[in-house]
Design a protein with these regions (language model features):
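A structural signal for short loop-to-beta-strand junctions that line the ligand-binding cleft
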Residues: 77, 85-86, 116-156, 304-309, ...
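Hinge/lid segment of periplasmic solute-binding proteins
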Residues: 93-147, 199-204, 294-296, 372, ...
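Extracytoplasmic "Venus flytrap"/periplasmic binding protein-like
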Residues: 50-123, 155-167, 264, 268-272, ...
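Glycine-centered hinge/linker elements that transmit conformational signals in sensory
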Residues: 175-176, 182, 219-255
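Short, solvent-exposed loop/beta-turn-alpha elements that line the ligand-binding surface or hinge
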Residues: 108-123, 209-236, 285-288, 299-308, ...
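Long, aromatic- and glycine/proline-rich binding clefts that accommodate carbohydrate-like moieties
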Residues: 293-300, 348-411, 415, 445-451
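Extracytoplasmic/periplasmic solute-binding protein
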Residues: 134-143, 148, 173-226, 270
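Extracytoplasmic/periplasmic substrate-recognition and gating elements
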Residues: 26, 137, 158-160, 239, ...
């Protein structure tokens, strides 16, 4: 059902350009729907409140939809009813779906039409390239941008004679065994849901310079095919992970077992995790008192040269079907959240990174990264910009129905770790099922050229 719904996103969005809610008498109001939940949802609401309190003409009504997936589905349903929000947050995985719908007001055009001058080159290239067209046009505003990092318990590593995090997965395997021998029951905590495909599969391919799919991971055409299963480095890595799991060097942690891997790390129960830099703030607030921990860039595999990791998180899209008065509010809101001072506040209360060079430089001048609890977050920027400008490796993933593709990959991982299925056969099956999804998406947009 979910795949059918997302597969139809283009048709639904492209034909439902109806007018939004009437403007309020005193302030011009617009709706902003976002997918974040929990602590991050509170931080988004605080940002909306700061904007609303900064002036007296506009009001942005910000409403969490509970998840990225729900945010996209609810936006589709709202178009059906002619009640679409002015701003909608769409995750990295949903970028191509909405990009091909034509149901949006391009970010660069919006800001120009509303009288704002934006230095689009100020955005970090690793972030901008993910959301830009082939001509470099920005269709949406990068918002809560992140990448994956390795979190490690420095106290535990000290007990095994180590003062640094593993730089390669081979070194990591040795560290996990040493931690186990030292009495730690959970050297590595991980999960195998569709959410974790991002850091364990996609980011692995990224930092090792390998492709998830042909056609530059889909950036060069809708006829892209998944090929991650044909990468010997990835296959060997998954076999290593399964071996660590079988030998209790790696432990699955999620809500079903009563503790997520992030919670397990913060409690000091597990010593290493891979997760978003966006979790840095939450871990800093919830970590066991006195626990000494840090972050590092993701390990590479063997002798592979390090490449840039992929940006995660989401961007903000302005939807068609609203008045110029409402679009003025949207433009003012985007201008507000782009200020370096706001970037500092946002990065302070979350773990997300500044999306612009100017914001990053402002944070450095303020000494943001000089000490705990924020030290180390700059590694996310280093990870996203590790490759030289001449690097020909893919700089992201642009596949239709990527959420469903991730689900099929997760199903393959579950077969491996839960049912002891063959690694290569399971990855091949996941790729085959994912390619079927891609072909259906391609058929939906037959003869359409990527922007």
């Amino acid at each position: 059902m979910q795949a059918k719904l997302l597969g139809a996103v283009g048709a639904l969005l492209a034909t439902a350009f109806l007018a939004g809610p009437a403007a309020a008498a005193e302030k011009t109001k617009i709706d902003f729907w976002f997918g974040n939940s929990g602590d991050i949802a509170k931080r988004v609401q605080e940002q909306c409140d700061r904007f609303n309190q900064s002036q007296g003409d506009y009001e942005v009504v910000c409403t969490s939809q509970g998840s990225y997936d729900a945010s996209l589905q609810n936006t589709i349903a709202a178009f059906r009813a002619g009640k679409q929000p002015t701003i909608a947050q769409v995750s990295d995985a949903g970028t191509l779906d909405i990009m091909l719908s034509g149901a949006f007001y391009p970010a660069n055009q919006l800001m120009a039409d509303m009288g704002y001058t934006v230095d689009w080159k100020d955005y970090f290239s690793g972030i901008a390239n993910y959301y830009a067209t082939s001509k470099g046009e920005m269709y949406s505003f990068p918002f809560n941008s992140s990448t994956a990092l390795l979190y490690w318990n420095k106290d535990a590593f000290t007990k095994i004679g180590k003062d640094h995090a593993p730089a390669t997965w081979q070194e990591a395997g040795e560290d996990f065994k040493a931690l186990k021998d030292a009495g730690y029951a959970c050297p590595l905590a991980f999960d195998i849901s569709n959410n974790e495909v991002w850091q364990y599969i996609e980011q692995f391919e990224a930092v090792n310079g390998e492709a998830i799919a042909t056609k530059k991971n889909g950036f060069e055409g809708l006829d892209a095919e998944l090929v991650f299963n044909k990468n010997p480095l990835l296959v060997s890595y998954i076999k290593d992970l399964k071996s660590w799991y079988d030998n209790k060097l790696a432990v699955i942690k999620n809500k079903a077992v009563g503790q997520t891997f992030v919670e397990a790390f913060a409690a000091g129960d597990c010593q290493v995790i891979l997760t978003s830099v966006g979790d840095h703030g939450n871990i800093g607030r919830t970590a066991k008192q006195g626990m000494n921990w840090g972050v590092s860039m993701l390990p590479t595999y063997g002798n592979a040269t390090r490449h840039s990791s992929y940006v995660g998180g989401a961007s903000l899209w302005v939807l068609k079907g609203h008045s110029d008065a409402e679009y003025k509010v949207a433009a003012a809101f985007f201008n507000f959240i782009a200020k370096p001072e706001e970037a500092l506040t946002w990065s302070t209360v979350t773990g997300y990174i500044p999306v612009r060079n100017s914001g990053f430089e402002y944070l450095k001048k303020q000494g943001f990264y000089d000490k705990a609890p924020y030290a180390g977050r700059e590694l996310a920027i280093q990870s996203l910009t590790a490759s030289p400008a001449s690097d020909t490796a893919p700089h992201g993933i642009r596949l239709g129905g990527l959420l469903q593709v991730r689900t099929e990959i997760a199903n393959g991982l579950q077969a491996i770790f839960v049912n002891n299925a063959d690694v290569q056969a399971s990855l091949d099956g996941a790729a085959d099922r994912g390619n079927q999804l891609l072909r259906r998406f391609q058929q939906t947009y037959k003869n359409v050229q990527l922007p």
